[in-house]
């Protein structure tokens, strides 16, 4: 794909020949349509497929932007010198070293229906036990919470690195002019980390649209398939039901969804950038 994009925009013949451009684009469209065309059965009318698409987008949106916004807040709060803040940053960074299976098993014990650490704490304070992973909204919350806890380390480090590149003189000049903390955040801090904010957003969207183990191990895709994701559906089609064509088709759909959100973020952040460069960045 990268080679095709490069040839399309660098080759002088393709650049000036409308007919060849049309043929080139048509060939790429045919390639993708062959990929998303199911070979075993027409699952486009399958409610499970569309429910998996919706679940994937919901989980990815809340977990990706939950990570991004929480990470920037923690980065600002811990961007200070001292042993205490170094330890705190290390603790957040260390969460990424946990394997996803181990993470899922730990959170399954924390939020298991009725007999779990969280429910034991609720009962100790006089509340009834709650089946967290057996309800739609709370099951999604557990998956999002586990994913945010697991992936927040790298964004914090990236935001801290960006914050340390902002000159202190800007803050000093703003204080002299009487700027409040909120004004300094909106007009100095946020513009200073805007490029890292885009990078973190794109990386998190790409990663969280591929959620699998958390959904598989924490909720099993339930209840009523309301936490089943596209990657989970690919796994079930390909390796459980041996419907390799359907699994491959869903994987192409997932690729297109990731491409749509990634290119949208890149293009919104820099609308003057040629769109083909955004395509190349996405492919890389």
Q: Each PLM stretch: what is its role?
A:
Residues 270-272, 277-284:
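Positively charged, low-complexity/disordered segments
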Residues 1-269, 273:
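A structural signal for multi-pass alpha-helical bundles of membrane permease subunits
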